[in-house]
From Swiss-Prot:
Cofactor: binding details: Binds 1 divalent metal cation per subunit.
Entry cofactors: a divalent metal cation
Signal peptide region: none
Sequence intervals crossing the membrane: none
Keywords: Carbohydrate metabolism, Metal-binding, NAD, Oxidoreductase
Protein source organism: Clostridium botulinum (strain Langeland / NCTC 10281 / Type F)
One Pfam family, short name: PdxA
PANTHER family: 4-HYDROXYTHREONINE-4-PHOSPHATE DEHYDROGENASE, D-THREONATE 4-PHOSPHATE DEHYDROGENASE
Protein name, per record: Putative D-threonate 4-phosphate dehydrogenase
């Protein structure tokens, strides 16, 4: 390696989806090489096929170790696992060989990160059904990464245009999400989110907790979750020394965070935070997985089987995920 830029590992995702295409397109962008040293973990045959789909012509430098990389615009440094029979791969279809290969790309990336060869990983889309067809018994990236890194409960943060958003609840019904707004849970997440920010090197500013009800309940007029759970949790966290305030009405808290008043927002349910970030900039909303011994960023879209193989998939999110990994990796504390 001829520079001190962070080395970012990029597993290419489900080879039947758009992952290989968005990765190939991303590595035509000078910004990526200005910020980091990217290494793909995948299959050379799949990458060559993706270049054909995208009308991109890049050299492939197959390597065994990160320090063999050239890290030069115009050349892809690739850890070639050679685990796909390209004649059997059906682009845009659920299939076991693709799910199994996608898992192996992730596993190799994690191994390299744990050994110190990679400073972070930026992941591409995988497909739950393909994983199942390939006898990979996980429902997604986060669960795979948690198991491979012995992490009990990873914490997801979204970042877009400098605004950071955490989630008190995610994949539960709205009715269930309301039941999960308890003092104990809110306090626990304030602490965990604060620790996550510190690991990323974010030390200035304070966190805001979003309200659940209209106008944060208006002193119990529109619901009492704020009075019973959110306010007591915030007050206790403040006594413990955490920089946090709220509840702030969800109709204004994200605007205030975007303007710089808060370094992050703890949203109380899935769509509250997703709508705010993705309306601001859908393609540049990037997921950062916290709480693991390795740093991971990810695009927040799927395999897009309907357009796989057409070269139409946008690489904006992938570039953003790589650049964000490069931004945080020098500050990341294991």
């Amino acid at each position: 390696m001829i520079n001190n830029k962070p080395i970012i590992g990029i597993p290419i995702g489900d080879p039947a989806g758009v992952g290989p295409e968005i990765v190939v397109k991303s590595l035509t962008e000078a910004e990526v090489y200005e910020k980091c040293n990217p290494i793909l973990i995948g299959d050379a045959k799949v990458i060559k096929q993706a270049m054909g789909f995208c009308n991109v012509n890049l050299n492939i430098n197959s390597i065994k170790k990160a320090d063999e990389g050239k890290f030069t615009l115009g050349t892809i440094d690739l850890i070639d696992l050679n685990n796909i029979d390209i004649d059997e791969l059906k682009i845009g279809k659920v299939q076991g060989i693709a799910g199994k290969a996608a898992f192996e790309y992730i596993k190799k990336s994690v191994e390299m990160a744990k050994e110190g060869e990679l400073d972070a990983i930026a992941t591409t889309p995988i497909n739950k059904e393909s994983l199942r067809e390939g006898n990979v018994n996980y429902i997604g990236h986060t669960e795979i990464l948690a198991d491979l890194t012995d992490t009990e409960d990873p914490l997801t943060m979204f970042e877009v245009r400098g605004m950071r958003v955490f989630f008190l609840t995610r994949h539960v019904s709205l009715r269930k999400a309301c039941d999960l707004v308890t003092k104990e849970r809110v306090l626990d997440y304030i602490i965990r989110c604060s620790e996550a920010l510190e690991k990323l090197g974010v030390k200035d500013g304070k966190m805001a907790v979003a309200g659940l009800n209209p106008h944060s309940g208006e002193h119990g007029l529109f619901g009492d979750e704020e009075m019973k759970a959110v306010v007591p949790a915030i007050e206790e966290a403040q006594k413990m020394g955490y920089k946090v305030e709220g509840p702030i009405g969800a109709d204004s808290v994200f605007h205030l965070a975007l303007k710089g008043r808060y370094n992050s927002v703890l949203s109380l349910y899935h769509d509250q935070g997703h709508i705010a970030t993705k309306t601001l900039d859908f393609e540049r909303t990037i997921a950062v997985t916290n709480g693991m011994p390795i740093l991971r960023t990810s695009v927040d879209h799927g395999t897009a089987f309907d357009i796989a193989g057409t070269g139409q998939a946008s690489s904006v999110s992938m570039v953003e995920a790589i650049v964000l990994a490069a931004k945080y990796s020098p500050k990341f504390k294991k």
